[in-house]
C-alpha cells in the first residue's frame, strides 16, 4: 500500500513539473512570437516604456542605466576647472556623466541651464536639449530644424521630457538603426572621408547612432528669413576630425564660445569628442563599433539580445574585451590602469600650467599690457586649453586613443608653457618681476576667486525646480508626452 502511495505521489509531482515545463515552453514560444511580430508602436513614440511589450530584455537592460546614479562633482575633484572656465557656465556646475536614464534630470537640475521663469528667459539656447531626449528628433520632424534651434532652452521644457532612449537610435516601425539628427550626416559629407548615412554598413551604424551626440560640436549662429537667429548644432569637421583639424576650422572662422573672464582669451569649449577620439585609436581603425563594447550581445535561454545597459565595458569583460583579447582580465586591467595613470598625470600638469597662464595674463592686462603684446599669448592659451579640454571632455580618451591623448595633452602643456614664457617678458616690461599666480586649492576658493555668486545661483535654481520645472512635467503629462510613473522612486541628486 505504501509503495502505491509513493508511486502516486511521484506521478503527481512529475505531472506538476511537466505542466510547469510546458507552460514555460509556451510562454517562451509566445514571447518569441511577440519579439518576431511587427511592433505596434507609433513612429514618433518617445515614451521609452511603450517599447517594453515587444522588447522586454532590451528595455529592462536600458532601465538599468538608472543604477548609474552617483553624482561625481568634477569641479570638486579638479577645482582648476573653475578658473579654466571662468566666465562660462561650466565654472558653476560640472559633473561626470550619469546613466542615460538621467539625461533630462541632469540638464534640468544643472546650474548651467540657469533658472528661467518662462519660455523666453534663461541663459542657454534650445540647442542645449539636442542630445538629451528622443523628443528632440520628433520636434525637429514636426517643426523643422530652423524652428527647433530658435529660442531659449526653456521654450521646450514641456515638450522634451523623456530621457535618451529607443527612438534616438531605432526606427520604431522596423527597429532598424537610424540617425534622427541631420547635422551628423551634414558633417560626414563635409569631412568627405567617413561613410555617410547613405553608404554606412550595419557595423558603421552601430557607431554612428552614438556619434549623433558623442562628438565635438558648436552652436552656429544662423540668420533666418523670418528675422530670427537659429543657434544650430554644427560639427566642425570640414577640415577633418583630429584636434588640429578642428582647431584650424575654429581659427579660420574666428569662432569662440566665450571670452575668458580673467585672461580675455577668446576660448573654445570642447564638448565630448568620443567619436573623433575613437577614430584615431586601435578600435576605431579596426572598426570595432561603440556597441561591440558598450552594448554586448547577451544570451538568455534561446534568446540572444543586445544589452542596452550602456556603460563601462570593463564591468562585462567576458562579453566585451575577452571576445578579442587573448590575455587574462587581470593583465588587461593593469594595462588600462597604467594608461589612465599616465593620462591623469599629464592632465593635472596641463590644468596647472593653463590656469597659471590665465592668471598671469590677467595680471598683464592689469599692469597695462597692450592688445598687440598679448595677441600671440592669447592664441597660445586658446590652443593650449582647447587641446587640454579635447582630451579631458572625452572621458574615455585614455582608453580609446591613449597615444593620441598623451600627445594632445603634451602639446597643451607645451603651448601653455610658451604663453607663460612670453607673459614673463611682458610682465617684466611693465615692471612686474615677482608675480606668482595663486594656487587653486578647492572648488569654493576657485569660485570665490572668479567672483561667482554661488548662493544666489543655487537659490534661484531651487525656485525654478520647485516651480516652473514641475509645471513643465504637468503640462507634458496632459499632452500625453510624459508618464510620471516612469520616474517613480527617482531621487533628485545634484552637486550643490
UniProtKB/Swiss-Prot annotation:
InterPro entries: Cyt_c552, Cyt_c_NO2Rdtase_formate-dep, Multihaem_cyt_sf. Heme c 5 binds at residues 283, 321, 324-325. It is an enzyme of class 1 (oxidoreductase). Pathway: Nitrogen metabolism; nitrate reduction (assimilation). The keyword Iron applies. Heme c 2 binds at residues 166, 169-170, 308. It comes from the Bacteria. It is found in: Periplasm. CDD domains: NrfA-like. Binds 1 Ca(2+) ion per monomer. Heme c 4 binds at residues 290, 293-294, 400. Its cofactor is Ca(2+); heme c. It catalyses: 6 Fe(III)-[cytochrome c] + NH4(+) + 2 H2O = 6 Fe(II)-[cytochrome c] + nitrite + 8 H(+). Ca(2+) binds at residues 216-217, 269, 271. Heme binds at residues 128, 131-132. Heme c 3 binds at residues 100, 210, 213-214. GO terms for cellular component: outer membrane-bounded periplasmic space. Catalyzes the reduction of nitrite to ammonia, consuming six electrons in the process. This is Cytochrome c-552. It comes from Aliarcobacter butzleri (strain RM4018) (Arcobacter butzleri).
